[in-house]
Swiss-Prot record:
Alphabetical GO biological process terms: chlorophyll biosynthetic process; protoporphyrinogen IX biosynthetic process
Organism the protein comes from: Pelodictyon phaeoclathratiforme (strain DSM 5477 / BU-1)
Taxonomic lineage of the native organism: Bacteria, Pseudomonadati, Chlorobiota, Chlorobiia, Chlorobiales
Catalytic reactions of this protein: (S)-4-amino-5-oxopentanoate = 5-aminolevulinate
Protein EC: 5.4.3.8
PANTHER family xref list: GLUTAMATE-1-SEMIALDEHYDE 2,1-AMINOMUTASE (PTHR43713), GLUTAMATE-1-SEMIALDEHYDE 2,1-AMINOMUTASE 1, CHLOROPLASTIC-RELATED (PTHR43713:SF3)
A single MF term (Gene Ontology): glutamate-1-semialdehyde 2,1-aminomutase activity
Glycoprotein found in the keyword field: no
Subcellular locations according to the entry: Cytoplasm
Cross-referenced HAMAP family: HemL_aminotrans_3
Name used for this protein in its record: Glutamate-1-semialdehyde 2,1-aminomutase
Gene Ontology CC annotations of this record: cytoplasm
UniProt keyword terms in alphabetical order: Chlorophyll biosynthesis, Cytoplasm, Isomerase, Porphyrin biosynthesis, Pyridoxal phosphate
Family: Belongs to the class-III pyridoxal-phosphate-dependent aminotransferase family. HemL subfamily.
Length: 431
């Protein structure tokens, strides 16, 4: 069991100055209990905390580190930019064009793209754009899906909101709530019902094509295509939120994996290489409504800053040059198979969902296909599992409802260590 003396001291100090002691709620360990671990250093597939304990990292900064932490090419590129270019200008820079052109080549739906500073900014901007383009007010999202902390999205939300048991947030006005309609993930009939009840009023349907903030929930075959058809028929803007799954499940995102092209796409995480970034883009006729070309306003002081773009560009270039996806899939299969073997040995029927290198082990025997089935998971048992894994040097997201990420830097030996730890943790969590 790792000693967390300094982490505990830092957490007590942090609570005096930072709400809850953290800058993002799930980091506080509220759903799993115990003391949050304060990290001091990361390298490759490992992190070291302030007490000197080392962990295999399956959080990957919650998604961006598909290539692991401190990748030498990304680090070198950042050092060059810092020394020779600068951190920010508040002016256009050539690098903006380079990353925009590259994104438009990679992602099927992109004809134009705008850089922002976070995934939340990207989704908020995309929804505003859809409303401006259609002249309609209402949006449809899906129960348990998380699209950042914008007011429109904190209605039956996932991620930290679900983890803390508060999927609806105070401070969201009744008017905003009335304009946000919730459908059931993987249930096209629930979407059609809302569309028919609000005929001509729906501006956008926004969805994670791989739901990654209710654990991991893949879209059922045909579901995304049915959404595409419905949106086309009804003049609704289809938005894929690929902040998490974009460039993770495939280079071109889930839309290339499933062969369904949305009208707008939001991106983040991997395209920042570990630095704050986001982007939204899509059809030219819609994107041309964005200011200053059009009348839908969006702006950001640090949008397109050299450091974030450098990390993002280098990450994308590595993904193109080295094509790590077959190797990531091989590693993901090893881990998935190992976990399933452990479950079988112990007579457990827990559900494991996976798409590419993102996965989730749900502590439930109910197949997890949407929000209502995800919340059947035993969070107390998951908490015991989490701490047993932590004690064995495996760092997972401190929530049942978050993804586990494999990076290119995880070795086969790392995976075997994780599989052994998984067996022990399943035993420790109770059967």
């Amino acid at each position: 069991m790792p000693q967390l003396t300094k982490s505990a001291e830092l957490f007590e100090k942090a609570k005096k100055f930072i709400p809850g002691g953290v800058n993002s709620p799930v980091r506080a360990f509220k759903s799993v209990g115990g003391t949050p671990v304060y990290m001091a250093k990361g390298s490759g597939a490992y992190m070291t905390d302030v007490d000197g304990n080392t962990y295999l990292d399956y959080v990957g900064s919650w998604g961006p580190f598909i290539l692991g932490s401190m990748h030498p090419r990304i680090t070198a590129a950042l050092e060059y930019t810092l020394k020779n270019i600068g951190t920010s200008f508040g002016t256009p820079i050539e690098m903006e064009i380079e990353i925009a052109e590259l994104l438009c080549k990679i992602v099927p739906s992109l004809e134009m793209v705008r850089m922002v500073n976070s995934g939340t900014e990207a989704t908020m901007s995309a929804v505003r754009l859809a409303r401006g383009y259609t002249g309609r007010d209402k949006i449809i999202k899906f129960e348990g899906c998380y699209h950042g902390h914008g007011d429109s999205f904190l209605i039956k939300a996932g991620s930290g909101a679900l983890t803390l048991g508060a999927p609806d947030s105070p401070g969201v006005t009744k008017g905003t709530a009335m304009d946000t309609l919730n459908a059931t993930y993987n249930d096209i009939d629930s979407v059609k019902l809302l569309v028919n009840e609000n005929k001509g009023q729906i501006a956008a349907i926004i969805i994670e094509p791989v739901a990654g903030n209710t654990g991991v929930i893949p879209a059922k075959p045909g579901f995304l295509a049915a959404l595409r058809e419905l949106c086309t028929e009804e003049g609704i803007v289809l938005i894929f939120d690929e902040v998490m799954c974009g460039f993770r499940v495939a280079l071109g995102g889930a839309q290339s994996l499933y062969g369904v092209t949305p009208d707008l796409t939001t991106m983040g995480k991997i395209i920042g290489g570990g630095l704050p970034v986001g982007a939204f883009g899509g059809k030219r006729e819609i994107m041309e409504r964005v200011a200053p070309l059009g009348d839908v306003y969006q702006a950001g002081t640090l949008s397109g800053n050299p450091l974030a773009l450098t990390a993002g560009l280098e990450t994308l270039k590595i993904l193109i040059d080295e094509n790590p996806y077959p190797e990531l899939e091989r590693k993901a299969v090893i881990l998935e198979s190992g976990f399933n073997d452990n479950l079988k040995k112990l007579g457990l029927n827990y559900v494991q969902n996976r798409v590419g290198s993102m996965s989730c082990l749900f502590f439930t025997e109910t197949p997890v296909v949407d929000y209502s089935t995800a919340v059947t998971a035993d969070t107390k048992r998951h908490g015991k599992y989490f701490h047993s894994m932590l004690d064995q040097g495996i760092y997972l997201a401190p929530s049942q409802f978050e993804a586990m990420f494999i990076s290119f830097m995880h070795t086969d030996e790392d995976l075997e260590k994780t599989i052994k730890a998984n067996y022990n943790a399943l035993v420790a969590s109770g059967q």
